[in-house]
From Swiss-Prot:
The gene is Arhgap20. It comes from the Eukaryota. GTPase activator for the Rho-type GTPases by converting them to an inactive GDP-bound state. Residues 365-551 form the Rho-GAP domain. One of its GO terms (molecular function) is GTPase activator activity. Residues 1-40, 745-772, 803-839, 935-955, 982-1011, 1074-1101, 1142-1182 are annotated as: Disordered. This is Rho GTPase-activating protein 20. It comes from Mus musculus. Residues 85-185 form the PH domain. The lineage of its organism: Eukaryota, Metazoa, Chordata, Craniata, Vertebrata. Residues 811-824 have a biased composition (Basic and acidic residues). Residues 194-283 form the Ras-associating domain. Gene3D superfamilies: Pleckstrin-homology domain (PH domain)/Phosphotyrosine-binding domain (PTB), Rho GTPase activation protein. CDD domains: PH_RARhoGAP (cd13319), RA_RHG20 (cd17115), RhoGAP_ARHGAP20 (cd04402). SMART domains: PH, RhoGAP.
Length: 1182
């Protein structure tokens, strides 16, 4: 088959073409078609999406793919010639520092090629090096960083780089290494010339020549060249004390040689590149083309190559520092792809290690060389002074990490000799730079040669032996090291003394700083390093705790002098502020800005956890002229109805009314008491701006605005500015002397107004009770015009006033318990509503804890606080008054029981006198339509009912239940739990009856319907008449039956559960029919027997109904009934009881019952001679 052109091949890939046009089937051209379509699709796509997809895709590993799967024929054809053969090829990982590169290597007999595998299985050439310029070595750890397998790796390099080559297996590694060493040696034999002159420049070496020219062979390594250079320069020493550097025009920075490289190959590679550029691109340059290889100085700067000899300690620092300037390609992280902007030089020029020391005058130099006459350099003294001054008040000093960029910039400034103002730097940055300085001291400040001796110190017996050994080891150190250690451990000891505030104990400090003070001389296993690190930490901890015994007692005075000298050197014109980059709060760091401020002693006394943001004592408008600190208590939580930007002026009231002084107070911790200034009243030392400030109360501080502490005494010229910006400080309101005098004058008025408020509240209660009763009567009268059906609306609820209290009321319900009506928004009079609104602001909110004002020094708040102390501690007041309340409650129960007994006796007497004048009539019970609603009662007995609510009777204490009425009890009630009410209007329900009926002999002062439970009465109940008979009871017999009933009810309640269905059936099957009797005691005996039978059959749930079965179901009677006589007799008793009730106000059960103490109904009668009667009974707990 004929070969197709690329255009025909592309056409064959199109789906619409037939096989006749392409000359081949689609199936045959399938794989190639997919491959080319993928390439075209990638070209059409936008560059960002293609880069993102490639970055997110899994990068194929060259180790997993076999070389046979990649077509290498086309790639190798460009290198193959008659004299070149391929020895081996395969995947490898090249590592340089922290960079990893996956490459595919090709080894020819005279050439080494490194290529990168592309996604379409093609190769891209990365390096092509002659074997004569290459070298190999086994120093893996000196080239690469991190975990490396030495069994699978070796060092492979060429001018002027070194890589760690890692292969798939040790066998592959050995095979590659042997082939490289063999053919490198063979190619070096072909070099011409065998030797070349090499100029060596000496730098940082005193008393020697500037440079020397030596002759090197093509097989000489860098270590051998160093030995020859030392002899030529007349320098005594070992080759380990010096290092050879290469300054190539190809690289931006000098490159250090480890020792196994070939300087001959490095220089010849530069000459060959020059020859290739001048003579043309040829595979190699013949020796004839290099007739003048010694005229390197005549070449351009970028083609030159110089070798520099430096001492090892400076060379080590230069190696790590210049690596930051050395350009090398760095793979971008896909995580930061959104920040790829502009040039990539800031990524490609990053140092290999961010903590690498910078060469110069300070870092990487031994202390004896830095210290002149055993005096520390000024930058080191400044840092120690700053840490000694600010470190004790800084939380997490030496532990909190700092910004690496700030650390690097500060190190560069210090290393270059530039004067640095440490006040402008973060204390965490200074602490980090100091640790970096310790890490860069050659062989550590404790000397790595004495490492084993230092580690064994903690294995000794007692502290005296340890101190003696430590002092002997210190004598072996250079004098400059000991001087620095004295200052350093003095600072650490001072920080440890304030560990309660900075949370840095001796152990925490030792853990943070021990790795920078001492480390082992050589690398060891991780297990041994961890064990040694622990021992070194214990040693440093012991030194911090016993530094005065080790270094002498004068170390404390040394630190004091140091702090004073540092304060004198720092002039007050330095006004630089820099926000701390640490994670700690900025306010806490602002408190640490000036340790010599008058409040420093106050801040130092703070304990752990007492410097939280909500407990910082704010200091505003600090007066430089006053010797004492003026602290203003933060006033917050003003009237929430006012906006934040609105000013609230204080004006004298025009008329006597409660004065609302909005004072926000909260629970004061012990730490805040310690912060409170101990000076006299603060009003005497307020500045002028603060004296004028009380004219207008300040707005609330926003949550985003920090509290500003003006503790810096050096910012005197900013005082006027910050006085204008006083609203941004945390002092939200300031009161002046005028306000203090005014508050003292209004205090007696407030006391009198409170008494008036209580009286008006009582008066408002009576008015609200009348309004409530009248409104209920009106609503009930409206419902009487609907015929025989009486509908009770759910909204028209009687408002009871009960004295029963729920003893477990929470403090949150306390303000609501002091209300006097059930619905204050609807029934309260205007003056009571205003009083409640004014007092509502003064109540402590539920979220605010109670406080006890012990250390408040503001004299103008004492009177206000003493008046509000009982409200702030309402929970404690309830607990103290609980016993007194129980005693008063019991006494009221006894009095209420007596009144009930008296009223019952009086009712019985009235019944006896009127029983002879009444006749029995048939009454048709009305069809009631009762909506289910909660019952109301004046006899609240939480102890007797399961739900805490009591049983009430709205119209009468006793009523008759019809034979066909459905009565569904919902809860068990007490047989005595009943309520007496007066008669209602005669006209309200007169249309519901065929003829008026009068019953006599009932033991109660009023007639009504008993609704002791929630009941559902059917509308469609068949109306049938029932025989009603008049019964006369003797008082003693009635009371005896009541006591027996009460005992039976209390016993049966505990043993027998209420069964609503059974009681319902009993009420249907057993209508209440009592025989008619004339008069006298037999009726009482028969009534007592019938009551006992009812109690035994129906249980306690129906006992109350048995008492009420003798009354007419109609709740409305004529005004001329004999019960008005009983009401007239009870009036004096009720008036007397009302006086007792008004004298003792008690909290209520809940917010709905808390506004009433007894059920009170005002009724109008048709009789002109009868006047409206107010009848109240107090419920008791029996």
């Amino acid at each position: 088959m004929e070969a197709m052109s690329p255009q025909q091949d592309a056409l064959g890939a199109q789906p619409g073409r037939s096989s006749s046009l392409t000359g081949m089937s689609r199936i045959a051209g399938g794989p190639g078609t997919k491959k080319k379509m993928k390439t075209l699709a990638e070209r059409r796509r936008s560059a960002p999406s293609l880069i993102l997809d490639k970055a997110l895709q899994k990068r194929p590993s060259t180790r997993d793919s076999h070389s046979a799967s990649i077509d290498t024929c086309a790639f190798l054809s460009s290198f193959m010639c008659s004299s070149r053969t391929l020895l081996i090829d395969g995947p490898v990982e090249l590592k340089r520092g922290l960079q990893r590169q996956e490459r595919h290597l090709f080894l020819f007999n005279d050439l080494f090629v490194s290529a990168k595998i592309k996604y379409n299985n093609n190769f891209k050439i990365k390096n092509k090096i002659r074997l004569t310029d290459m070298w190999t070595a086994s120093c893996v750890e000196e080239v690469g960083e991190g975990n490396m397998n030495a069994q699978k790796s070796f060092v492979l390099g060429w001018p002027t780089v070194n890589f760690v080559a890692t292969f798939s297996s040790p066998e592959q590694k050995d095979k590659w290494l042997s082939l490289l060493q063999r053919y490198i040696a063979l190619e070096k034999e072909k070099d011409y010339p065998k030797s070349i002159p090499l100029k060596i420049f000496a730098k940082d070496i005193g008393n020697c020549a500037y440079f020397k020219t030596i002759t090197v062979m093509n097989s000489d390594t860098a270590s051998e060249v160093i030995n020859m250079s030392l002899q030529m320069l007349g320098i005594t020493g070992s080759e380990r004390d010096y290092q050879l550097w290469v300054n190539s025009g190809k690289e931006a920075a000098p490159y250090p040689l480890i020792g196994h490289e070939y300087p001959y190959g490095i220089k010849m590679s530069h000459l060959r590149d020059t020859a290739l550029l001048t003579q043309g691109s040829r595979d190699s340059a013949s020796p004839s083309q290099l007739q003048e290889p010694f005229l390197m100085e005549q070449l351009p700067r970028e083609m030159q190559c110089q070798f520099i000899l430096k001492p090892t300690r400076l060379a080590t620092a230069q190696q790590l520092s210049d690596s930051s300037q050395k350009t090398f390609k760095r793979r971008r992280s896909i995580i930061n792809w959104a920040f790829w902007r502009g040039s990539s030089t800031h990524l490609d020029n990053l140092p290999m290690s961010p903590t690498s020391p910078m060469p110069g005058q300070l870092f990487g130099v031994s202390l004896p060389d830095l210290c002149e006459n055993d005096n520390l350099p000024k930058p080191i003294l400044d840092m120690l002074s700053f840490l000694n001054q600010k470190g004790p008040l800084t939380k997490g000093i030496f532990r909190q990490s700092a910004n690496m960029k700030s650390c690097r910039e500060l190190k560069e400034k210090l290393n270059s000799g530039i004067e640095v103002h440490l006040d402008c730097e973060s204390i965490f940055v200074i602490a980090s730079v100091l640790k970096d300085f310790l890490r860069n001291i050659p062989e550590s400040i404790f000397s790595s040669d004495l490492y084993d001796h230092w580690v064994c110190v903690m294995d000794q017996g007692n502290d005296e032996e340890k101190i003696n050994i430590i002092q002997r080891l210190l004598d072996q150190l250079p004098r400059a090291n000991v001087v620095f250690l004295r200052y350093l451990f003095g600072v650490l000891h001072n920080i440890e003394q304030h560990s309660l505030s900075n949370q840095m104990t001796a152990f925490n400090l030792a853990v943070c700083i021990a790795p920078s003070i001492l480390w082992p001389p050589a690398s060891s296993s991780p297990e041994l390093e961890n064990e040694f690190t622990k021992k070194v930490s214990l040693l440093i901890q012991f030194l911090i705790e016993n530094c005065c015994r080790v270094f002498g007692e004068e170390i404390a005075s040394l630190l004091g002098e140091l702090s004073e000298r540092s304060d004198r050197e720092h002039t007050p014109d330095i006004t630089c502020f820099q926000m701390n980059d640490s994670s700690y709060d900025s306010l806490e760091n602002e408190l640490n800005e000036e340790a010599d401020a008058p409040c420093s002693d106050l801040v130092k006394k703070l304990g752990q956890g007492s410097r939280s943001m909500d407990s910082v004592l704010t200091l505003s408008d600090y007066d430089l002229e006053q010797p004492e600190v003026e602290g203003l208590l933060t006033l917050s939580n003003f009237d929430l109805d006012q906006s934040k930007e609105e000013h609230i002026p204080i004006k004298p009231p025009l008329e006597p009314k409660p004065v609302n002084v909005f004072v926000g107070y909260r629970k004061v911790s012990l730490g805040e008491h310690a912060r409170a200034p101990a000076g006299p009243g603060t009003l005497s030392c307020l500045p002028v701006a603060a004296a004028d400030a009380p004219k207008v109360l300040r707005r609330h501080r926003r949550s985003s605005e920090p509290s500003i502490d003006y503790l810096d005494t050096k910012l005197s010229y900013l005082r006027e500015f910050y006085q204008k910006k006083l609203r941004k400080s945390s002092c939200d309101a300031v009161l002046s002397r005028k306000d203090e005098d005014y508050l003292k004058q209004t205090q007696p008025q407030k006391k009198g107004d409170k008494v008036c408020l209580k009286q008006s509240s009582v008066t408002g209660t009576d008015v609200s009770k009348r309004n409530t009763a009248n409104e209920n009567i009106k609503k009930k009268s409206l419902s009487g015009h609907e015929g025989t059906q009486v509908t009770l609306f759910t909204k028209s609820k009687p408002v009871p006033i009960s004295v029963a209290s729920y003893s477990h009321g929470s403090s949150q319900d306390h303000p609501r318990k002091q209300a006097f009506d059930a619905d204050p928004c609807r029934f309260s009079p205007p003056h009571l509503t205003d009083a409640q609104k004014s007092s509502r602001v003064q109540h402590r909110r539920c979220s605010e804890p109670s406080i006890d004002d012990q250390n408040y020094k503001l004299s103008y708040l004492r009177g206000i606080y003493s008046m509000k102390q009982n409200k702030a501690s309402c929970e404690a007041g309830l607990l103290h008054g609980e016993d007194d309340y129980l005693r008063r409650h019991k006494s009221l129960q006894i009095e209420g029981q007596k009144l009930i007994n008296q009223s019952l006796v009086m009712g019985i007497e009235v019944g006896k006198s009127s029983s002879s004048h009444q006749s029995t009539e048939k009454v048709l019970p009305p069809r009631l339509n009762l909506c289910p609603r909660a019952s109301y009662s004046s006899l609240s007995s939480p102890g007797s009912s399961p739900s805490g609510s009591s049983v009430s009777s709205q119209d009468s204490a006793f009523s008759q239940i019809s034979e066909h009425s459905v009565f569904t009890p919902t809860e068990t009630s007490s047989p005595i739990d009943c309520t007496f009410q007066t008669q209602r209007k005669q006209e309200e329900l007169s249309s519901d009856f065929d003829s008026p009926s009068r019953l006599s002999g009932m033991p109660g002062p009023s007639m009504g319907q008993a609704s002791s439970h929630l009941a559902y009465l059917r509308k469609g109940t068949t109306e049938q008449p029932s025989q009603m008979h008049s019964v006369t009871l003797h008082p003693s017999a009635w009371l005896r039956s009541g006591l027996v009933t009460l005992k039976n009810w209390s016993l049966k309640k505990k043993t027998k559960a209420a069964r609503p269905e059974d009681r319902k059936v009993c009420s249907l099957k057993e209508p209440l029919e009592l025989p008619s009797c004339a008069s006298g005691t037999p009726e009482a005996d028969s009534l007592q027997e019938s009551q006992d039978d009812l109690q035994g059959d129906e249980g306690p749930g129906q006992t109350a109904c048995g008492f009420s079965s003798y009354a007419c179901q109609d709740s409305e009677q004529h005004a001329g009934s004999p019960f008005h006589l009983a009401e007239s007799r009870l009036k004096p008793c009720m008036k007397l009881y009302k006086g007792e009730e008004s004298g003792g106000q008690y909290p209520c059960d809940n917010p709905w019952e808390g506004a009433s103490s007894s059920l009170e109904t005002t009724e109008d009668t048709a009789n002109p001679g009868a006047e409206p009667t107010t009848f109240a009974m107090t419920g008791t707990d029996i």
